């Protein structure tokens, strides 16, 4: 009896030890997730190797319902007990998306917000609480809302406490992707600004992909071209902003009331994120901090050769920059890297050791080592609505300081030449060389300061555009979620959001045009990033517009006005793009006799021919008409079936497409070629992207097919005629060659046989044999 009981207990203990834990993620390398991008096959995370893989059946694309998403999770992870799904907090970059019925998958990435497949019993996320941050939570047992609702609650709660939302997670599930509470971590603004590179990496990308230590401007005339170009660009942007503000004055007063507290709450963060130095640190400390950072490739996957300062070796070393993100320890050349970091590190060693340290062969003064009175006053002033005026004053102060210093050097040079009249010839040459190097140093220093000024100004303008777009998107989504929604208010919010996106696109295009005029080589380096940025704007506008059609009543009432707004924006964008690329010109300094590019038949390509992007990626369209929207009784913004109407057997209203790029314009610049992301983009699902065939492209394809068909038919007819003619000519009726040695009788007999004569004797014997 006792041995049997012991054996039973041992068997039970062994079975429990081998039992799979209730937490299905235990022992898995990655969390079960799925990602969707309309027009492409769904992707799912391989929990064994941590890589994204396409749909195993090769047929499943984006799913419009939460029930369908849960079912799909259960299909791709049959060995796991999937009980619920929840939208992820942050977007991810996924490559190698596949299309239906195509074996080859494209390698360029898409940025999507995946869905997490929850395994077993629901367990809340373990949130990390940094120093000086607070952990909070809210639960309401009478409310059952989506992930987006609770994210908004957490963000507003942190804003009321003058803090930023650091991280959050859902609590108490009550349905598929619906919950009764949220847990979150709020951090002070200063703490968030210290971690801004990691928390808002995509937002920083917008300041990086055209910035950085781009070009060593040693020519003063070229610097002036850059400054004039940037002045005109920013002036145009500010004029458009003023016009847009007038256009939206007819909107609801709620919009203005919501905008004021947002600007007050984010003013401090914006100023911290966009300035290249701070008011509490000296210039040397900032440069020392920059040069002490590790080389960072960034999230993008380009292979750009750059240099960074290695503190351990005390010299600059090469590395590959991805094209976006990263940090400021990133220089174009080794000389520029040593000019910035070498002198500062040498001064640091001099302070710590008390012994003089050689500055090395580089004699160029740097922006960091220059007198900070001219530039720092602008850099230390937070950006505001008067940014352009502050930039003009800073530039004037910089030029005045440069002229004064150059005048002082010239006076010293003249005095030295007078004193060197009686010196040997070698000493005179040494004096001249000394002052020539000093003048070159001042010119290089002024060029670096101008470049720093322009980069800071561009970053601030970009930050203002980002903030306005983010605010417009949040107000637009809030208006859609109102109960009941007000169509006029929704349209005004949508109008402001579309204008914000268009200003961002125009700002990007104008900046690239100025760079192309001043430095074509630099333009060639950043053109793929510019194209990626434009594609992201198109996709984001498509997704945001698709949210409108989840509220059919509102969409139907304002459909005509939305179509008119989009058509107006399309015409304006086409004009801007046509003016930009119709006759590109390259600046050659003071040479005013250079022929135009149309005369020399020179073309400047915006993107490489063998790039990764196609024309289809740049053709956003109005997703579908109001009459094709499925009924949505609950006023919630959820993902829907985002396929084009033609693929779903539905009608689409004409003239409702978003801004497209004309095929005639595309033929002039080859546009078949990485992602800036901000917090305003995380509130909607990236999978809602729509594709449609371009009408102009279809016409060209039809004409090409017709011409090809005619050519093929002609070739077939000619071939048949020649074959038939060959058959007719194969029968030979020529003269039979006769031996010349035969007798005249035999020759006569041969002629008779040719005319049909038959020998009676032969004929007789043939009849007898038959």
Curated annotation (Swiss-Prot):
Q: Where is this motif: OX-2?
A: 344-365
For this chain the motif YENPXY motif maps to 757-762
The residues that the entry says bind Cu(2+) 2 are 677, 681, 684-685
Domain E1, first and last residues per copy: 28-189
Q: What are the transmembrane regions? A: 702-722
> Locate the BPTI/Kunitz inhibitor domain: which residues?
291-341
Site Susceptible to oxidation: give positions: 706
> Which positions does the record annotate as the modified residue Phosphoserine?
198, 206, 441, 730
GO BP: adult locomotory behavior; apoptotic process; axo-dendritic transport; axon midline choice point recognition; axonogenesis; cell adhesion; central nervous system development; cognition
Location of the region described as Heparin-binding in the Swiss-Prot/TrEMBL record: 391-423, 491-522
Q: Which domain of life is it from?
A: Eukaryota
Residues annotated for heparin binding in this entry: 96-110
Task: Enumerate the residue ranges of region (Disordered).
Answer: 196-281
Residue ranges of region Required for the interaction with KIF5B and for anterograde transport in axons? 756-770
**Site feature (Reactive bond) residues:** 301-302
Write out the domain note: The transmembrane helix undergoes a conformation change and unravels partially when bound to PSEN1, facilitating cleavage by PSEN1. The basolateral sorting signal (BaSS) is required for sorting of membrane proteins to the basolateral surface of epithelial cells.
What protein is this chain from? Amyloid-beta precursor protein
Q: Tell me what organism the protein belongs to.
A: Cavia porcellus (Guinea pig)
Organism lineage string: Eukaryota, Metazoa, Chordata, Craniata, Vertebrata
């Amino acid at each position: 009896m006792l041995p049997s009981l012991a054996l039973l207990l041992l068997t039970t203990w062994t079975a429990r030890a081998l039992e799979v834990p209730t937490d299905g993620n235990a022992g898995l390398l990655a969390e079960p997730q799925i990602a969707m991008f309309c027009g492409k096959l769904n992707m799912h995370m391989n929990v064994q190797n941590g890589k994204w893989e396409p749909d195993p059946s090769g047929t499943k694309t984006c799913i419009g319902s939460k029930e369908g998403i849960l079912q799909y999770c259960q299909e791709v992870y049959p060995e796991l007990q999937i009980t619920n799904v929840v939208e992820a907090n942050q977007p991810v970059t996924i490559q190698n998306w596949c299309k239906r019925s195509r074996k080859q998958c494209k390698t360029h990435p898409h940025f999507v917000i995946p869905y997490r497949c929850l395994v077993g019993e629901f367990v809340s996320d373990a949130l990390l609480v940094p120093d000086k941050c607070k952990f909070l939570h809210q639960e309401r047992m009478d409310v059952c809302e989506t992930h987006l609702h609770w994210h908004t609650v957490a963000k507003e709660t942190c804003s009321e406490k003058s803090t930023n939302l650091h991280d959050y997670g859902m609590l108490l599930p009550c349905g598929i992707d619906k919950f009764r509470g949220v847990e979150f971590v709020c951090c002070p603004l200063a703490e968030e600004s210290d971690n801004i590179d990691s928390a808002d990496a995509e937002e920083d990308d917008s300041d990086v992909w055209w910035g950085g230590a781009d070009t060593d401007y040693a020519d003063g005339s070229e610097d002036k071209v850059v400054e004039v170009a940037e002045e005109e660009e920013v002036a145009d942007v500010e004029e458009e902003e003023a016009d847009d503000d007038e256009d939206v004055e007819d909107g609801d007063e709620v919009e203005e009331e919501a905008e004021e507290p947002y600007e007050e709450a984010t003013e401090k963060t914006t100023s911290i994120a966009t300035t290249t130095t701070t008011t509490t640190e000296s210039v040397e400390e900032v440069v020392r901090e920059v040069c002490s950072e590790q080389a960072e490739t960034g999230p993008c996957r380009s292979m750009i050769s750059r240099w960074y300062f290695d503190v351990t070796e005390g010299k600059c070393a090469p590395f590959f920059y991805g094209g976006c993100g990263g940090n400021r320890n990133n220089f174009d050349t080794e000389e520029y890297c040593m000019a910035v970091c070498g002198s500062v590190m040498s001064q640091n060693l001099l302070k710590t050791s008390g012994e003089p340290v050689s500055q090395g062969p580089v004699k160029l003064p740097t922006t960091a080592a220059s007198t900070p009175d001219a530039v720092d006053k602008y850099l230390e002033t937070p950006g505001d609505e008067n940014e352009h005026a502050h930039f003009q004053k800073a530039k004037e102060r910089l030029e005045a300081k440069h002229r004064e210093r150059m005048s002082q050097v010239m006076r010293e040079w003249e005095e030295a030449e007078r004193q060197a009249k009686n010196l040997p010839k070698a000493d005179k040459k040494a004096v001249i060389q000394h002052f020539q190097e000093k003048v070159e140093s001042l010119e290089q220093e002024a060029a670096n300061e101008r470049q720093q000024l322009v980069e800071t100004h561009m970053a601030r303008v970009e930050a203002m555009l980002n903030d306005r777009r983010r605010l417009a998107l949040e107000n637009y989504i809030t208006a859609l979620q109102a109960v009941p929604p007000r169509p006029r208010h929704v349209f005004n919010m949508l109008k402001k959001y579309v204008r914000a996106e268009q200003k961002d696109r125009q700002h990007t295009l104008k900046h690239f045009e100025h760079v192309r005029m001043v430095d074509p080589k630099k333009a060639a380096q950043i053109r793929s990033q510019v194209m990626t940025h434009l594609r992201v704007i198109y996709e984001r506008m498509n997704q945001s517009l698709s949210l409108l059609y989840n509220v059919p009543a509102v969409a139907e009432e304002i459909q005509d006005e939305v179509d008119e707004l989009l058509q107006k924006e399309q015409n304006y964008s086409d004009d801007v793009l046509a003016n930009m690329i119709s006759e590109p010109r390259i600046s050659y300094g003071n040479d005013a006799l250079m022929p135009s590019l149309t005369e020399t038949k020179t073309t400047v390509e915006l993107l490489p021919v063998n790039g990764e992007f196609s024309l289809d990626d740049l053709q956003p369209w109005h997703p579908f008409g109001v009459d094709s929207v499925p009924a949505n009784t609950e006023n919630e913004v959820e993902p829907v079936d985002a396929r084009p109407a033609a693929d779903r057997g539905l009608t689409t209203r004409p003239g409702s497409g978003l801004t497209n790029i004309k095929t005639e314009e595309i033929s002039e610049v080859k546009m078949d070629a990485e992602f800036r992301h901000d917090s305003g983009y995380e509130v909607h699902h990236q999978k809602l992207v729509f594709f449609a065939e371009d009408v102009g492209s279809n016409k060209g394809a039809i004409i090409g097919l017709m011409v090809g068909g005619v050519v093929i038919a002609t070739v077939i007819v000619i071939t048949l005629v020649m074959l038939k003619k060959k058959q007719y000519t194969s029968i030979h009726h020529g003269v039979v060659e006769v031996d010349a040695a035969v007798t005249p009788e035999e020759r006569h007999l041969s002629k008779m046989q040719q005319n049909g004569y038959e020998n009676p004797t032969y004929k007789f014997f043939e009849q007898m044999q038959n």
